[in-house]
Curated annotation (Swiss-Prot):
Role according to the record: May play a role in embryogenesis.
Pfam families named in the record: PPR, PPR_2, PPR_3
Record-given protein name: Pentatricopeptide repeat-containing protein At1g30610, chloroplastic
GO biological process, one term: chloroplast mRNA processing
Transit peptide: 1-40
PROSITE patterns recorded: PPR
Gene: EMB2279
Lineage: Eukaryota, Viridiplantae, Streptophyta, Embryophyta, Tracheophyta
Basic and acidic residues bias (residue ranges): 194-219, 265-284
Bias type Polar residues, positions: 254-263
InterPro entries in the record: DG1/EMB2279-like (IPR044645), Pentatricopeptide_rpt (IPR002885), TPR-like_helical_dom_sf (IPR011990)
Length: 1006
């Protein structure tokens, strides 16, 4: 027999069989969106197959046979109200007591009150229904997998457990307080634990007594209550016997016709508590509890069995056992405390209950729903199925339990006032993802390049980025903008080691890396990436990748590698790939104009004019005509090779086939400049302007340099001053046309700031052109004009300093050097660097070389001291010779400044400087200072330098001095050494030996 039941998906669906066995398991653990799940089931106790259908769009649950056409499965309105009412009731109850004391307990109840067990769970289905509803309360989600494994027991074990649960009583309590009434009033009073009284008092105070509906039961419901009361009476009697052994002062009096009572000492707080409970009890229920004739018989049987149970409990209390033995596993009750909390509840707590049918179909519904769910989960191979994009939301894979994939509650069945923490967060927006990627790029850019691999992986994974082809490409792009090409290669290596990362368009990532490496001028690394692309069919280069690597190699001048790339384009893959669906896949390509232009760029760097004719031949074979850009590059190749006649020839060919561009005119102007034809260069630019071709700034810059090198500085400056005002005037006209008069000043200032740097570069180029041509005066004139327009930078000042010194204008050079040195004293913040220039190493070396060459030792000393003051160190290879010459010329302060500088920096002076200082001290008669300088360096000089302080070396030095001076020196050295044992190879030891040999030689000669 099969029953098809449709109900709200928030509860469960059921299939009922004749044995009425039930098995419970949560049905919906995780939200499915816009999907339909159909599972075929083979019932164990049914011959016919059933189909379990979950339509998650409409939240319908149904059971159909395979022969049915559609899933026409909708819950009835009464069933829907019934389930929703139970769910809302469960949500309001946050705490439940383990044991509910009857209405008359405590001494204040009515003797003829009608008792009824309201929420006793006879079947496993209804007992689990309470847990199921509590599980979907306000702050609880189904997560207890241990309960689910226990709930997989069959129906017989479930019924046996419920029966044993009815016999189980509170094992931790030291006393029982019960009040029974059979014909009159019979009471049993037992002292109970203080914690139990406080908890029970708090629960009784918060009980609700104004429920609007009663419980209507049919004849089958009365029979069910009979079984419940029989088992209750047995348990209470057993508890009473047990308490009898623990309390020696219990006096039990029984009366068959009148009043029978069992009296025990009672605590005062216990009486106050029951008095308070009776005060809050509700006795004005709006509707009674309708029962049939069998209900009256039930009350008689219940009361008789309750008295027997109490007597049994009193006898049982004689034993010393503190716990009540039960047949059920104690671990199950400890793991399921919420199920043991709800035992009994008064009829007076609710005026109106849940309407049930005569056959108790609510219990059967839940039991069969659990059983069907268990069968569905056992037969549905969820591991082999692949989750779709929408099903994957919120799924958490667990190899031990497939149910972990559905560990979240369906949001559609949550109440509006409940928390939505379980619902997946919305997808990250594109802007937010871009911000995360850029932040990660900055973190990686600032980190150490030699950071460990685990630390790099941690930084990558902690960015909260879902790594796809697009996100990795953007990460490489941001790293390229920051100029960190090493980190780009590290990111690619990290991706190659990730087994979980499956890229569909890895070619795009490699191509982006090629672009970054090309902009960073890293041709070798780009070629390595290109070789890596050839190893996989998914990353095999396309035309975009070939263009990128060709441009990179062409700018670097690697012609051989560039021809290798061209051969790779035209040939099939050398590696044999696995056969794919692309049977006719052919990666062979022909070079296009971009690749050929890259070859011309390489020829410019290598100055190989033969490559230009090879490009023309290849274009002719393909039937293509050279573009203006190609002609311009060919002319540039001929200019680099100094074949000026070919430049003019190709320019004439370009005029016949197409209109020359600004690049071609620039190459032509540079050619005329090299030939010394400045007038023709001017006419060429005028012809370009007459044709309506807009020249670039580089063109006018080259023309201005041509004029300045020819001595026509005014015309060159006019050319420079002509370009910028024209641009500013055009921008100003555009602003007026756009009716944005109020933004004119702001835009003009912005344009001036943008044009500031190119203007400095332009003037610097003009000065360099004049210096190269030998026109120092013109260079000085342009330098003075430049100060009126913009502030010269360090490069401009160094060029002019060298020009002054080469042109014999030493005074002008000294003034410029002094101005640059004094600017360092007036810098207080970063904005001062824009208008002031500080000298660098090139500035000091240029000034020192010129002063030493012209033997201007005073200026040399000033420049040398300024160099040390600005933080630049003494360079022995460059400065030692000049320092020794200055010392011999009488500028000993230069040598002393060098000695002090090296002492502060813990550096050992070179041996020529040590000897020179020693000689100067001996000449002045300061033997103590001379010996002290050697003693301080004794033991610190390297072995390679000790050769300069050998005995023979000192002998050559001492030959310059008189005998009396050497004798005095020997005495001072002996006093310095004293009793200390100096090795024969030490500096002072060698000096002493040399002095003795020198004196012996002089004495022998005399």
């Amino acid at each position: 027999m099969a029953v098809t039941i449709s109900t709200n998906a928030f509860v469960n669906a059921s299939l009922l069989d004749e044995s009425r066995n039930s098995f419970w398991r949560p049905l919906f653990h995780q939200p499915y969106y816009n999907c339909r799940r159909v599972v075929r089931l083979n019932s164990r106790k049914l011959n016919s197959k059933v189909m379990f259908c979950l339509n998650l769009n409409t939240k319908e649950v149904g059971l159909q046979k395979p022969g049915d056409k559609g899933f026409e499965f909708k819950p009835s309105f009464d069933q829907y109200l019934q389930i929703m009412e139970s769910v809302k009731t469960a949500r309001k109850k946050k705490k439940f007591d383990r044991l509910k004391v009857e209405e008359d307990d405590g001494g204040g109840g009515n003797g003829d009150s009608v008792y009824e067990v309201k929420d006793m769970k006879i079947k496993s289905g209804e007992l689990k229904d309470e847990t199921f509803r509590k599980r979907y309360s306000r702050q609880e989600i189904v997560s207890d997998k241990r309960n689910e494994r226990v709930f997989k027991r069959n129906g017989e074990i479930e019924n046996h457990r419920v029966a044993t649960d009815l016999k189980w009583s509170k094992s931790g309590e030291s006393s029982v307080a019960l009040k029974l009434s059979k014909s009159g009033e019979s009471s049993v009073t037992v002292p109970e634990d203080e914690s139990f009284r406080k908890r029970y008092s708090k629960q009784e105070y918060h009980r609700s007594s104004d429920t609007s509906r009663g419980i209507e039961r049919g004849s089958r419901g009365d029979e069910l209550d009979l079984v419940v009361e029989e088992r209750r009476v047995q348990r209470i009697a057993k508890d009473a016997r047990w308490s009898k052994s623990r309390e020696s002062s219990v006096a039990v009096k029984w009366s068959n016709s009148g009043e029978s009572s069992v009296t025990m000492p009672k605590d005062e707080s216990f009486r106050r508590r029951y008095s308070k409970q009776e005060h809050h009890r509700s006795s004005d229920t709006s509707r009674g509890i309708a029962r049939g004739s069998k209900g009256d018989e039930l009350e008689l049987v219940v009361e008789e069995r309750r008295v027997q149970r109490i007597a049994k409990d009193v006898r049982w209390s004689k034993s010393d056992e503190s716990l009540v033995p039960v047949s059920e596993d104690e671990s199950f009750r400890r793991g399921n405390p919420k199920q043991e909390m709800v035992r009994y509840q008064r009829v007076s707590d609710t005026s109106r209950g849940i309407e049930r049918g005569s056959k108790g179909d609510g219990l059967d519904l839940l039991a069969e729903e659990r059983r069907i769910e268990r069968l569905a989960n056992e037969r549905h191979e969820i591991r082999s199925s692949k989750l779709s994009g929408t099903r994957r939301i919120g799924a958490k894979r667990n190899d031990d339990d497939d149910d972990s994939l559905f560990a979240m509650e369906t949001p559609a069945f949550r109440f509006s006032d409940e928390s939505s923490d379980i619902v997946d967060k919305p997808a990250t927006s594109r802007v937010e993802m871009e911000d995360r990627i850029e932040k990660l790029a900055k973190v990686l850019n600032g980190a150490d390049i030699n950071m460990p691999e685990w630390q790099f992986s941690k930084a990558i994974r902690s960015a909260k980025i879902r790594y796809t082809d697009y996100t990795v490409m953007r990460l490489i792009h941001f790293l390229g903008k920051l100029g960190n090409w090493r980190r780009v290669l590290q990111v690619i290596e990290w991706l190659q080691r990730q087994d979980r990362y499956k890229s569909n368009k890895i070619r795009i990532i490699y191509t982006t890396a090629l672009n970054v490496l090309g902009k960073s001028r890293r041709p070798v690394e780009a070629l390595n990436v290109f070789h890596a692309m050839l190893l996989q069919i998914s990353s095999y280069p396309d035309m975009v990748a070939y263009r990128s690597i060709a441009v990179t190699l062409g700018q670097a001048g690697h012609i051989k590698e560039l021809f290798y790339v061209i051969d790779t384009m035209r040939s099939p893959p050398k590696k044999k790939f696995k056969p794919t669906t692309l049977e006719k896949w052919d990666p062979r390509l022909e070079p296009d104009v971009v690749v050929y232009n890259a070859v011309l760029n390489a020829c410019v760097q290598r100055k190989q004019w033969e490559g230009a004719f090879w490009v023309l031949q290849q274009l002719k074979q393909r039937g293509q005509k050279p573009s203006p850009v190609t002609y311009g590059l060919i002319m540039e190749v001929m200019l680099a090779c100094e074949k000026y006649n070919l430049v003019h020839e190709f320019f004439r060919k370009m005029q016949k086939s197409s209109i020359p561009n600004a690049l071609a005119y620039r190459v032509l102007v540079n050619t005329l400049w090299k030939e010394g034809k400045s007038d023709e260069a001017v006419h060429t630019v005028e012809d370009m302007e007459s044709r309506g071709i807009v020249g670039s700034a580089a063109l006018y810059y080259d023309l201005a340099r041509c004029l300045c090198s020819a001595g026509r500085c005014n015309e060159g400056l006019n050319m420079v001053n002509f370009v910028n005002p024209v641009v500013l005037k055009l921008i100003e006209n555009l602003i007026y046309k756009a009716d944005l008069v109020h933004t004119i000043q702001f835009q003009l200032k912005k344009i001036c700031r943008v044009a500031n740097k190119p203007l400095v570069v332009t003037y610097t180029g003009l000065i360099q052109a004049c210096v190269d041509s030998g026109n120092i005066k013109n260079a000085a004139y342009i330098f003075d004009q430049m100060k009126k327009v913009c502030s010269p930078n360090l490069v401009t000042c160094n060029i002019m300093l060298k020009a002054y010194l080469q042109g014999g204008l030493f005074e002008e050079a000294r003034e410029l050097f002094q101005k640059m040195s004094e600017d360092g004293n007036h810098i207080k913040n970063s904005s001062d660097f824009e208008s002031r220039v500080l000298p660098d190493t090139y500035t000091f070396n240029t000034m020192l070389d010129t002063c030493a060459e012209q033997e201007k030792w005073d200026d040399f000393g000033y420049a040398y001291r300024e160099m040390l003051r600005h933080g630049y160190h003494f360079n022995a290879k460059r400065h030692l010779r000049m320092v020794l010459e200055a010392s011999r010329a009488g500028k000993e302060e230069v040598m002393e400044a060098t000695w002090e500088h090296m002492r502060r920096s813990n550096r050992i002076p070179p041996s020529p400087l040590i000897k020179e200082r020693f000689f100067r001290k001996l000449e002045k008669g300061d033997h103590i200072s001379a010996i002290s300088s050697l003693a301080d360096l004794n033991g610190k000089i390297e072995e390679t330098e000790l050769r300069a302080f050998s005995t023979s070396a000192w002998s050559r030095v001492l030959s310059r001095f008189e005998q009396d001076s050497v004798l005095r020196l020997m005495d001072d050295v002996n006093r310095r050494l004293g009793s200390r044992s100096e090795s024969s190879d030490s500096v002072l030891g060698n000096l002493l030996s040399s002095c003795k040999d020198y004196l012996k030689t002089r004495t022998h000669n005399l």
